[in-house]
Amino acid sequence: MKKIIWASIVVVTSLCVNVSAQIIQGYVRNKWAQPIPNASLQFTSLSSGKTFTARTDANGFYQLNLPFFEKESENRSFLVFDVFPNPFSRETNFIVYALRSVRATVSIINRNGQIVRILYNAPLSEGYNYITWDGLDEKGAEMPEGMYIMQITSGKTTVAKKVLRLTNAPSSGTVAGNLDPEVLLETVVATYQVTVEAPGYKKYQNPKFIPQGKSTHHWVLFKEDTLPFRTVDHYLAIRKADNTYEPIFINGICLGISTPGTNPGNLAATKEEYRRWLTLIWEAGFNSIRTYTLHYPRFYEVLDEFNREHFERPLWLMQGVWLDEELSSPNLYESSALFDSAIAEVLDCMHGNRVIGERQGRAFGTYNLDVSDWIMGYIIGREVYPDEIIYTDSLMLHQNPNLTFYNGKFFSIDSASPSEVWWARRLDFFMDYQKSRYNKSVPLSQSSWPTLDPLTHPSEPPYPISSEDWTQVDLSKLKVVAPNGGYFASYHAYPYYPDFINDDSLYRTFSDSYGPNSYLGYLTTLKNYYGKKPLLLGEYGVPSSWGNAHYAHSGMHHGGHTEKQQGIYNIRLIKNIHQTRCAGGYLFALMDEWFKTMWYTNPIGSTYARRSLWWNVVSAEENFGFISFQTDTPNFKIWPELSVNCWIDKAKFSYDPAFFYIQLKLKRDINSNDSIWVAIDTYDRFLGESTAKNGFKLDSRSEFLLNINTTRPLLYITESYDTYGIYHGYSEPTQKYRSTITDGEPWNVVRYTNGWKEYIDIDSVGVLNFYLYSNPLDTPTSKDAVFFKNKEILVRIPWTYLNVVDPSNQEVLDDDRGTKERETRITDGFQVQIFDNWKLCSRSTEKRMLWPRWDKAWPYNERLKESYFILKNSYPNLDLKPF
């Protein structure tokens, strides 16, 4: 669904339906899903102070009549929120909150009062209903610009909202920060404080409960337990009803939530989005979620709500405490006070005991709901860089040569480096704060990665050629002094990085049922080093990007995978994690995140401020999720149609936040002897190459040349504009990184480098994937650039392949290699010429095609990738139980 700005609310009064009060019922259970009889429940209205009570029967069941509205006169059947975006060009949304299931009809009416489209004619579901209009009429024809009415009718009640359709309406972004539809819902419905109590259990208090029109609500009570989870030989374990501990293999997922148009500090998700995402995670078969930092209170409220409703199989939380990267000094000791303060803040928030004032870039609010019982452990910190460790160790040893041990209240360490001592102190502070303030302890770790592992890697070049095996942090020496949840090692370990995972001869001897697997060798060796200490993969996974930033011995590369391959490889990885007796792993990640950057695409990428406004399908780091974000179908009417008038009939063009599109209509089927050439001039008609690869003279000098055929479609770039080797600094002198005037100079297939000077690897992205509809053995993939279907060809080219630095800003690469800066230029639009290998066709667009810039993310839909369904269908068949 789309992110919605809830600008206003219309209250609809039903004349015939009494929904002022509803029956609320459910069960009160403990964490082992056992019923709790004779538990008392109290619902106190936050506005009137009126209290409603109930008690559970022998089966833990309760029931009571609870008003949904404060006053009997306020009987309502549904609530209508405003239309968004408005004005719109592609899609707009009508949002209805139904207090009960009632039949409704949603219509689009033009300015003449004619109904041009019935969008919806069915019962509304209880809760939120999202109804989208794509600007088309009942027959699928595009409606002209102008004012329209979106109208909902249910029984005798009708509500209408005006909406303006413009062909080039300004892009509408997403709502950020702490605005949530439930904030508006609270203004019109009753809100309660809920207290649930039973002898022998902790009192449960929910300070702000909204029934939401649902009739069933379950509650979970926990025993007073100082050690609900602990580490037990290789695994984290949960206390059972008989006070023994049962090991858990963690099959978790990392909860990144940076939707298009947002950055991590926004934490912009609404309650409704959290509910949907947790449901997807749960239905896929995951048992835990990991957060890196503190979220807004609404996330923890939804987590508690979700786990109460799924008490037989809850989603356990692995909560993080972030260590700032923007530190004043690389000396870790100078960040101690700030980091300890962050630890205390997170612990207080998890126990419902902190109010944080408004601040920029971080979550804030009133944390008054105790969710600590849903937390199985904490991972604090981040991937610390080798230079930070080297700097800290050298400086602190110089100041204090005896800084090699620490004897704390809960942890101690000997024969340690100052950095290891620093981590031991932070872990000890964490455990002491939690134990002294809240009389509780759960397993604890700090984030690490292979770059700092305690192993020696003979294949890795020494510093300064490489810093990947330069230093280490070894907390296997950490000892438990006083009873607590224990320590477990946590690594972000992927199958393609660093190089030693692929190159060490020992690791390369390993294989699994899929084939050679040096990653399995690395995990086996690392786990053997830690012995019985639990080793958890805090991150693992492969992305479904078009570009491949790093090759892997196992074939599980840093990108270059289809969504299907992504799913298969992620199943392979969790199998590897399980068979090496690791404690489990957290798949990275829930969703694609457009804000992310990486070295592979950085030299021709947009600035941080604008990166989240468009989708770079080439970048591996943007495409790790199993949720993708798609805008509506490209509009091929925004630019004039090009009549080629030969066996190639017509050409149309379009764009979206990810691709530039070319649609060709043919008068006959393309055959194996045909080649269609498309010359693309991306900026400045006076720059570029004048001659195509086949010797054909171009109408307009161009930077790119696309060869469409049914055996090997290729995308070429002029030698001058070629960026091959740009990141590593070993491009040829003839590569200017800008378009120049050339006549008969070479055309190169678009390629990227994903290795170092000494280890050059080539990613030939210009060799385009294609789908041939007439081939019964062919199936479309998420990486296909060319689609052949009957007498139609659709081409989609990622912006990055065309050296478009930032499509949202109309910005293309136009560099001066003589400066340190990377120069760009605002394009004057694309000009395209189409011709064939028979030289029977040749036609160019008359005008340059320039798309409007946008400053906010386009409205989008969430789409589950093919990889999600592979995971969901595979997990039940995997025996992911602790050994």
Predicted regions and their residues:
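Short, surface-exposed loop/turn motifs with a glycine/proline- and acidic-biased composition
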Residues: N121-K156, P170-G173
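Surface-exposed, glycine/proline- and aromatic-rich loop segments on solvent-exposed faces
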Residues: V644-T753, L813-K839
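Acidic/polar low-complexity flexible segments
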Residues: D681-E703, N790, N803-F883
